[in-house]
Amino acid sequence: THSGGACNSHDQCCNAFCSTATRTCV
């Protein structure tokens, strides 16, 4: 997983949590 990256879904976060508010991986 990684954090701080832009995302639209958890798939784009390598299954990390994707914040829908900021659209970033956390």
UniProtKB/Swiss-Prot annotation:
**Primary localization:** secreted
Coiled-coil regions listed: none
Q: List the disulfide bonds.
A: 7-18, 13-25
Q: Which UniProt keywords apply?
A: Disulfide bond, Knottin, Secreted, Toxin
Q: Where in the cell is it found?
A: Secreted
Q: What else is known?
A: This peptide corresponds to allele E1j. Has not been merged with other alleles since they may differ due to geographic variation (see strain in PubMed:19606224).
Similarity annotation: Belongs to the conotoxin O1 superfamily.
Please report the name of this protein according to its UniProt entry.
Conotoxin Eb6.17
